[in-house]
Amino acid sequence: MANKAIVGEKVGMTQVWDEENQVIPVTVLRVRPNRVVQVKTQERDGYSALQVTFGQKDIEKMTQPEAGHFANSGVAPGGRLVELRLDDVAEYQVGQELTVTEIAETGRVDVTSVSKGKGFAGAMKRHGFGGLPASHGAHKVHRKPGAVGQCATPSRIFKGKRMPGRMGNQKTTILNLMVVEAD
């Protein structure tokens, strides 16, 4: 788990040049101050985490349990509640604001997000299969996955077989990304 974390929104992408005149692709994030709503500890909750919110939301547009949760903590209601699993939460208090400067000091970050959904994809796109021959008798099977299992024994396809299906729209993490600039 992490020592520090923060929630942000992807705005877009751009590029910058480094000292050797190499182009670096850069993802631009909007990171609003995150307000701590609840501190979850190992002793009380069984795991350590921070529950944070960001942005603003009218209390009239919330359910009563949500509004009560914010009222009990004394924190202004935000757009979403997000839980950040951390190793040590002793240094955090309810109502504390987390800003991007705390994360930017480290220089490197791990980014977790939901990947782009690509819908139902074939085996070649989804798993990088090579496909079948383009000629020499191949008939309408050029992008097919090929054989998927054995014959009478075991009379089934083993679990985990790479086949066509939904691609993307899954939680994914990229490790050790460089922080280029934070303001």
State where each predicted segment sits.
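Extended basic (Lys/Arg/His-rich) segments that typically form rRNA-contacting surfaces
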Residues: 1-183
